[in-house]
Amino acid sequence: MKKQLFILSQYLLPHHLLSRLAGCIAECRVRWFKNAFTAWFAKRYQVDMSQALVEDLTAYEHFNAFFTRALKDGARPLDQTPGAVLSPADGAVSQLGPIEHGRVFQAKGHSFSVLELLGGDAALSAPFMGGDFATVYLSPKDYHRVHMPLAGTLREMVYIPGRIFSVNQTTAENVPELFARNERVACIFDTERGPMAVVLVGAMIVASIETVWAGLVTPPKRELKTFRYDEAARAPIHLEKGAELGRFKLGSTAIVLFGPDQVKWAEELVAGSPVQMGQGIAAPKA
């Protein structure tokens, strides 16, 4: 019964209003409040601050600064194996495997469309049909910056509006096409392994998604918006392997897509496997 009530609440709650309220709280600079809230959060979720560039919880100007904290140099060494594909984030593998019939596996009995995930653009989604995907879930305690799995040149970014369902095992198993319904930002890169998509998926109380080249992505009007970066008028944006791509102000999920016959996921990785940014999660297939 508790599970059914939780799922029902996901459909009834005012997602965007709650996220705006969470954003206001997370940006609050009232010293006693932000210190107390940050300390409670760190204790509640057992956040390891020993690897943070700034270990003192009270030194952050607001909760979001703590949540998107930088790590010390060397805290996340990059796998130096030639051709290695890196985990884009700290977290746990939600699912990974082949893209079959244009769909990505979500949980038992559920999948979602690559076409819908990328905003309904057939030309954008076509290179990934028959390819491979990995979904990484970032829990509240994790480092919340997202990094490049491979070096790449940005070709396109798409903001796709949507709901903001909570993202966890329960919703993955009970909300159809969860990741293709939530608000998200899809980033398409040209890499040594062909096109690569990194999709940052929002969730309830995720106040915003940022990228290093555009800052806050959420447009004033919540409508689908495409930003092209392969035009002559724009300077190319190239990011090296392991470079920061973006960040969640409060957490969620990163999904990585590759085209057919490009990568082979590490055999030891299964649903639930913990991963760290910079860890090798795949090798070139050919």
Swiss-Prot record:
Cofactor(s) the protein requires to work: pyruvate
Pfam families in the record: PS_Dcarbxylase
Places the protein is found: Cell membrane
GO biological process assignments: phosphatidylethanolamine biosynthetic process
Membrane topology: Peripheral membrane protein
Subunit structure, as described in the record: Heterodimer of a large membrane-associated beta subunit and a small pyruvoyl-containing alpha subunit.
Function: Catalyzes the formation of phosphatidylethanolamine (PtdEtn) from phosphatidylserine (PtdSer).
Keywords, ordered alphabetically: Cell membrane, Decarboxylase, Lipid biosynthesis, Lipid metabolism, Lyase, Membrane, Phospholipid biosynthesis, Phospholipid metabolism, Pyruvate, Zymogen
InterPro entries: PS_Dcarbxylase (IPR003817), PSD-B (IPR033177), PSD_type1_pro (IPR033178)
One of the record's GO cellular component terms: plasma membrane
Active site annotation, chain numbering: 90 (charge relay system), 147 (charge relay system), 252 (charge relay system), 252 (schiff-base intermediate with substrate)
TM region positions: none
Pyruvic acid (Ser): residues carrying this PTM: 252
Keyword Cytoplasm listed: no
Species classification: Bacteria, Pseudomonadati, Pseudomonadota, Gammaproteobacteria, Pseudomonadales
Statement: the UniProt record of this protein carries the keyword Repressor: no
Coiled-coil stretches: none
Pathway per the UniProt entry: Phospholipid metabolism; phosphatidylethanolamine biosynthesis; phosphatidylethanolamine from CDP-diacylglycerol: step 2/2
Domain of life (superkingdom): Bacteria
Gene Ontology molecular-function annotations: phosphatidylserine decarboxylase activity
PTM statement from Swiss-Prot or TrEMBL: Is synthesized initially as an inactive proenzyme. Formation of the active enzyme involves a self-maturation process in which the active site pyruvoyl group is generated from an internal serine residue via an autocatalytic post-translational modification. Two non-identical subunits are generated from the proenzyme in this reaction, and the pyruvate is formed at the N-terminus of the alpha chain, which is derived from the carboxyl end of the proenzyme.
Site (described: Cleavage (non-hydrolytic)): 251-252
Protein name: Phosphatidylserine decarboxylase proenzyme
Catalysed reaction equations from the record: a 1,2-diacyl-sn-glycero-3-phospho-L-serine + H(+) = a 1,2-diacyl-sn-glycero-3-phosphoethanolamine + CO2
